[in-house]
């Protein structure tokens, strides 16, 4: 069973069942509007989250390794912090929006990490894509410090994060949800409550990443075949996006290829990592994932060819014998 929470409201009572899924009916808790919330990591997703929380009335403290980004956020009404520890000293809830388990470890437990500065009973909402086993272990470690943890990976891209409309896949104890509700409502459009055990949110996220990675790889392969066969790339995109072969990733990523714009919104190396987590999880259960393994190899090949920091659509560059679209010159 899971519970879907609606955005911009805090959870109250249960009001109905939809297809066997219990749906929480939520009401705005205006007393939470002045709560201090910290956001660690102002990348494509983190900056959108911080801005959404600011619009929702929270006092948002933020830190990032890039001081220019935090200064920009401060000019918009946020509070720039020099380190996770400085941020934690001022906040009751921290949202970590970093890339992986290693960065999560650093911002929480490293030099000037948040954990040592947090008051007992504070909440950490972890949004990184990590191994489910890491999420379980992290929950136990934070509990030993008297802290609450919500395993809460995210999806939807930078645009949905900026609009406060992203999807969150969450799991954790009731006390964590009680502390998190207003913050979740301020930063997400859909919050799926998957259980009271840490790691369930991360399991669902890596399954999502399995599909996302395979879809991007398949989209690149389809476009590469079209180019090889002399099909006009723009025409191919138009037809597929109005046909049964379309996917969200095809529709979203192929325009990057058509514009020859590989500015990373999500990089090739992200899928090297995420599909690696998928395969590690399946390997521990001795479960075969042939499509995931092939897609992972494609992203690995793109990364080893020097495209790791480019947009994940750059996986198309591994295909030989094709001429990719070039950047179009602006009209005079």
Task: Label each region the model flagged.
Residues 163-164, 168-171, 192, 198-229, ...:
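Active-site-proximal catalytic alpha-helix in oxidoreductases
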Residues 25-97, 122, 190:
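NAD(P)+-binding Rossmann beta1-loop-alpha1 motif at the extreme N-terminus of oxidoreductases
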Residues 4, 13, 17-28:
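Short, positively charged and aromatic/hydrophobic N-terminal segments
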Residues 202, 211, 246-310:
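Interdomain hinge/lid region at the active-site interface
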